[in-house]
């Protein structure tokens, strides 16, 4: 398969064609300009059947009706109304004429629209809806439960005969057996991944809790080489359950302003379009569109009952054509609601349809997620009581992943059955029998994970990470490294990890050996959440003073290019035992017993100062105990082989740690106490972007040599690294207490979207500020106190009353993947050997 297509597929999506007897399809254009009209409403009158046009103006849906009235409408154009006979399977070419029409006191024009909120009946209608949006909310009930069936599929889009004849696909002539037809676009598609879920959802108001009991989960497709848990967490985060009554709707890791938001009337234009019957009830067709089509909002329709409840029977959302959103070429969200006997609104059916494209000109990925909800109950059950006693939010039955096909045949809704979709596992078996696909999958696995599996399925051992194989520095010269780790397929409780490295200049072997016992049975990797383990670890390697890359390996080849000489390096040897316990509540703690020996080098000598005498010291030891506390409520991860990345930063993360060592205890040369605390939080500003804030503070309480002091984290590379300083030199400052901040504001194009030229580029603005206020007490300053190691770097300094501050402005979304920041150093600008400003770069792929 095409590398680009597979890359895009890994950005996640979903699909599920529905079957019907007759096809209604065609294209809608502007009668004057002949240009296609995207997002026009296409429906059969007095029914809920229909769709909206895609970005190319085309529409496609199926119906069982042999005769119906087709209505096509879009803001600023005359409606198209015609009796059709779908049984003829005709294709309709509809040219809509622009018009000027009245909505009460509101006048709408096709080109220059003079929209007014004052005295606009649609705006007043929406205000009343917003005021009553919590009425009949299911979340006002004390309890409810429901059954959920969910199907998520990915498919190669527009897999027509022309594409099938290309050399890449001619090798796999059997693919034609699996081609299906999209019920939305009418294009042929090839489903390459399918996921199914059968579960029961539980909700309790007080104390507030939501649980999901998974009875069955099924997965097959080209993404099998990735972590199953990681992919599922990422998909769940990208395609979150949508509540249109919230102020913001979370999709594609972003937040979009809901048409029923408290700020909705300032963000959207609203129009009362028509009155129609939906499920036997007269409903107003309320259309909406953002004032600024590049902003993070929706076009769409809400079909609202004409009574005092303002009940939404059906919702249809899509993205404006010009929205500043990456990789999503088309999105359609459809929700249908029903009422309980007491009027409570219940979500009955939901479909999210997406067309993903990595670049223009590609057919990309067709994706769809369908969710059916049934059997709502408002009386607590024994099963619910059992679920609420479980600590995890998602409870998965032991046999959930191994359900037989008979289970799915019995529980799968009839509408979700598609022979092509449900045979993805058979498709994958045939694909992997071809060497060209087998090796392509292997290469992609290495590129995306950084590791080489030692077997085709359920690998016992991974070799890697490959991006750390070659690196170098001033002390070691060229450095090579090889390593790997075991998996749960070898032993679900016992895990090993390690590497061996060699420097050709210092001719020394370094390495790491780690053995971890997990008290919980793991499915794939040792670091799966939640961790409850005991770990033994020994490491002997170089110590790059003042550099601590928190989000990547120090051996990452992409960090090899430095803005200054990397010569603040010594050696260390460390043995430790760590007990870790993570809880589903988000709280975790870690206890570590550690003995460490730091060794000097010709670059970083240890010279002990006594008056005017400096005595060389080869090394020193510290034996310490450490306690770390962490709380991150509702944190979700994308799981990889070697680490896990949070996929949601909405909830705050609190950390607190303390390290203690006593002189003479287990060979420790010093008494050492070090305390650190931190908080991290993402703040969303609806249409105005979001801000990531990281605050930290720490203190060393005792008299210790400089390797045990607090050295701000200097980033010597030209890449953008969080929680590090792009223009600070390594070991430039020494502190025994500090307070730091890292604030980055992502505007999501809020300003650029208003500049005609820039909004076409879809660039997005970034403003950042990082700083640190530190202090070094006299007892830890070798210039004022004897018995300490002299600072080995001539330019090392202590801070006065002025904090170190650097600020930057940047542009992200350059070619959809690049971020460029220009950074200024605002303080300590006259220090010798420093950069006052500089350009930094990173790869940053985001929706």
Segments the model singles out, each with a brief description of its role:
Residues 1-27, 42, 101-110, 526, ...:
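Bacterial Sec-dependent N-terminal signal peptides
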Residues 44-46, 71-82:
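A short, solvent-exposed loop/turn motif at the edges and junctions
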Residues 101, 107, 111-283, 289-297, ...:
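Structured extracytoplasmic
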Residues 24-30, 57, 94:
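A short, amphipathic beta-strand motif
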């Amino acid at each position: 398969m095409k590398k680009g297509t597979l890359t895009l597929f890994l950005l996640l999506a979903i699909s599920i064609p529905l079957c019907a007897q007759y096809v209604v399809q065609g294209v809608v254009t502007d009668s004057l300009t002949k240009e296609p009209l995207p997002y026009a409403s296409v429906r059969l009158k007095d029914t809920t059947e229909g769709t909206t046009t895609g970005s190319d103006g085309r529409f496609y849906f199926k119906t069982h009706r042999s005769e119906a009235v087709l209505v096509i409408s879009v803001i600023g154009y005359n409606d198209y109304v015609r009796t059709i006979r779908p049984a003829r399977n005709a294709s309709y070419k509809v040219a809509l004429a622009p018009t000027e029409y009245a909505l009460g006191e509101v006048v709408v024009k096709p080109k220059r629209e003079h929209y007014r909120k004052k005295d606009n009946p649609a705006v007043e209608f929406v205000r009343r809806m917003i005021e009553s949006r919590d009425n009949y909310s299911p979340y006002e009930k004390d309890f409810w439960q429901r059954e959920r069936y969910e199907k998520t599929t990915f498919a190669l889009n527009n897999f027509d005969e022309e594409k099938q004849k290309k050399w890449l696909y001619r090798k796999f002539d059997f693919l034609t057996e699996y081609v299906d037809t999209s019920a939305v676009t009418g294009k042929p598609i090839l489903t390459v991944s399918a996921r199914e879920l059968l579960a029961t959802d539980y909700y309790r108001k007080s104390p507030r809790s939501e649980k999901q009991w998974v009875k069955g989960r099924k997965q097959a497709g080209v993404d099998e080489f990735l972590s199953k848990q990681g992919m599922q967490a990422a998909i769940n985060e990208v395609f979150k359950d949508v509540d249109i009554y919230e102020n913001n709707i979370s999709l594609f890791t972003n937040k979009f302003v809901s048409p029923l938001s408290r700020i909705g009337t300032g963000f959207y234009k609203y129009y009362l379009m028509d009155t129609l019957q939906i499920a036997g009830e007269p409903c107003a067709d309320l259309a909406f569109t953002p004032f600024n089509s590049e902003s993070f909002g929706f076009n769409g329709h809400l079909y609202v009952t004409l009574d005092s409840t303002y009940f939404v029977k059906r919702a249809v959302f899509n993205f404006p054509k010009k929205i500043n959103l990456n990789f999503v070429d088309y999105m359609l969200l459809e929700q249908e609601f029903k009422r309980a006997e007491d009027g409570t609104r219940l979500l009955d059916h939901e479909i999210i349809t997406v067309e993903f494209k990595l670049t223009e000109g590609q057919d990309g990925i067709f994706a769809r997620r369908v969710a059916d909800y049934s059997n709502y109950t408002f009386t607590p059950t024994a099963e619910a009581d059992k679920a609420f006693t479980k600590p995890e939010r998602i409870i998965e039955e032991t046999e959930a992943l191994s359900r037989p096909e008979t289970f799915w045949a019995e529980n799968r809704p009839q509408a979700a059955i598609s022979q092509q979709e449900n045979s993805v596992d058979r498709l994958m078996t045939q694909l992997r029998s071809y060497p060209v696909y087998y090796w392509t999958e292997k290469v992609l696995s290495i590129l995306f994970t950084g590791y080489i599996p030692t077997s085709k399925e359920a690998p016992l051992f991974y070799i890697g990470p490959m991006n750390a194989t070659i690196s170098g520095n001033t002390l070691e010269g060229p450095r090579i490294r090889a390593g790997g780790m075991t998996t749960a397929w070898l032993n679900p409780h016992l895990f090993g990890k390690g590497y061996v490295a060699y420097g050709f200049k210092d001719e020394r072997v370094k390495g790491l050996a780690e053995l971890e016992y997990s008290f919980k049975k793991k499915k794939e990797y040792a670091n799966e959440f939640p961790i409850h383990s005991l770990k033994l670890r020994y490491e002997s390697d170089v110590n790059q003073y003042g550099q601590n890359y928190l989000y990547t390996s120090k051996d990452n080849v992409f960090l090899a290019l430095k803005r200054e000489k990397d010569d603040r390096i010594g050696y260390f040897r460390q043995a430790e035992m760590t007990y870790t316990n993570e809880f589903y509540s988000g709280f975790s703690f870690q206890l570590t017993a550690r003995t460490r020996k730091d060794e000097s080098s010709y670059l970083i000598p240890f010279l002990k100062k006594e008056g005017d005498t400096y005595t060389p010291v080869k090394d020193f030891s510290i034996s310490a105990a450490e306690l770390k506390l962490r709380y991150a409520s509702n944190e979700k991860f994308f799981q990889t082989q070697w680490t896990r990345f949070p996929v949601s930063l909405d909830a705050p993360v609190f950390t607190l740690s303390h390290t203690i060592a006593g002189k003479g205890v287990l060979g420790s040369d010093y008494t050492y106490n070090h305390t650190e605390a931190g908080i991290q939080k993402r703040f969303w500003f609806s249409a105005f972007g979001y801000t990531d804030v990281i605050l930290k503070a720490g203190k060393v309480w005792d008299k210790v040599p400089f390797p045990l002091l607090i050295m701000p984290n200097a980033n010597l590379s030209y890449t953008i690294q969080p929680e590090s300083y792009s223009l600070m030199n390594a070991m430039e400052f020494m502190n025994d207490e500090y307070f730091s901040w890292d604030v980055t504001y992502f505007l999501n194009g809020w300003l650029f979207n208003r500049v005609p030229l820039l909004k076409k580029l879809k660039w997005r603005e970034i403003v950042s500020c990082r700083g640190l206020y530190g202090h070094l007490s006299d007892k830890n300053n070798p210039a004022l106190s004897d018995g300490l190691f002299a600072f080995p770097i001539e330019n090392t300094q202590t801070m006065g009353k002025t904090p170190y501050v650097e600020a930057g402005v940047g542009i992200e979304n350059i070619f959809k993947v690049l971020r460029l920041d220009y950074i200024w150093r605002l303080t300590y600008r006259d220090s010798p050997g420093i950069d006052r400003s500089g350009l930094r770069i990173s790869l940053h792929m985001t929706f």
